[in-house]
């Protein structure tokens, strides 16, 4: 199986059902890059390439993958299929669809049968999927946990700065800048 490799020894697998999902899923890759966590990224269709999905799930752990982020739209079976084939944590990213604005994708991923868990983030929220993957990895890798602490502190600082500006300027001036 040929996989687009960001690293020779990836810890996270980012997979998606179609290349049309890439504009959403790239946000997971960006976060992992920001944190210096190696990953791989590829396309696997649960419906069009089920053998590829099977092979990916079965071999992910032996390749060193520790968490899988799976994005899919519409019927969105990819995260569930992968979760049914591996003991690795799978994080599902529902991709917004034209027909139902992603509600179909969300429900397909959330409504897994007992015994086949898939952690699910908000529609099109690959960024949170990557942050959740980092929290999972942080259990084993203290340096990732420390980077997450700094990331959260930085978020807090930015919000506090914005709050101070708004309070000083008033809402009309704040919005006009």
Curated annotation (Swiss-Prot):
GO molecular function terms attached to this record: 5-(carboxyamino)imidazole ribonucleotide mutase activity
Enzyme Commission number(s) of this protein: 5.4.99.18
Residue positions binding substrate: 18, 21, 48
Keywords, in A-Z order: Isomerase, Purine biosynthesis
InterPro entries: PurE_ClassI (IPR033747), PurE_dom (IPR000031), PurE_prokaryotes (IPR024694)
The organism's place on the tree of life at top rank: Archaea
NCBIfam families linked to this entry: purE
Alphabetized PANTHER family for the sequence: PHOSPHORIBOSYLAMINOIMIDAZOLE CARBOXYLASE, PHOSPHORIBOSYLAMINOIMIDAZOLE CARBOXYLASE CATALYTIC SUBUNIT
Family according to the record: Belongs to the AIR carboxylase family. Class I subfamily.
Function: Catalyzes the conversion of N5-carboxyaminoimidazole ribonucleotide (N5-CAIR) to 4-carboxy-5-aminoimidazole ribonucleotide (CAIR).
The protein's name: N5-carboxyaminoimidazole ribonucleotide mutase
Gene: purE
């Amino acid at each position: 199986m040929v996989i687009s490799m960001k690293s020779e020894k990836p810890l996270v697998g980012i997979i998606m059902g179609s290349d049309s999902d890439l504009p959403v899923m790239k946000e997971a890759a960006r976060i992992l890059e920001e944190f210096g966590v190696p990953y791989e990224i590829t396309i696997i269709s649960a419906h069009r390439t089920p053998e590829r999905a099977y092979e990916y799930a079965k071999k992910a752990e032996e390749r060193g993958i520790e968490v899988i982020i799976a994005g899919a739209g519409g019927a969105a079976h990819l995260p569930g299929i992968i979760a049914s084939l591996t003991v690795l944590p799978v994080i599902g990213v529902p991709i917004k669809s034209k027909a139902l604005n992603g509600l179909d994708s969300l429900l397909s991923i959330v409504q897994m049968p007992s015994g086949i868990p898939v952690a699910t983030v908000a529609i099109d929220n690959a960024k949170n999927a990557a942050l959740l993957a980092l929290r999972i990895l942080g259990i084993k890798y203290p340096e990732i946990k420390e980077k997450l602490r700094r990331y959260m502190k930085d978020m807090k600082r930015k919000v506090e700065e914005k709050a101070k500006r708004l309070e000083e300027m008033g809402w009309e001036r704040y919005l006009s800048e």
